[in-house]
């Protein structure tokens, strides 16, 4: 089964159209599902800026990416595992702005999942895909809970975004 991720890099904080069009990169990554995660991971990591900072105390210079890998990779894996594949012609979209990275997955919440209970309710729309991704060690079935515990401020933004999806 193939899946597509469309990566769009926007110059600015909002996408513009017409004479102010500000998309500086637009790339589609089309791969079988098990290769898609690796391909997207490599491509997106290459798009991130890397900052060099001098550590306080040791004086050593260390590099850190614009966005830590864990949250955005979890978002991509989750989107691949749980997107609505019945929505033909749709794709996962990763939009990179100057101040944020957004991951959109086609389809509405499945079955009993809502914006309010998503952090503790488990339901897999694509049981076979989720099982195979677990066997290949891409999924541990606790991604969103781990994300919320690790990134509480970003989780608040995520909840607000998820609530918009249900309207």
Feature locations, PLM:
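C-terminal regulatory or interaction extensions
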Residues: 1-167
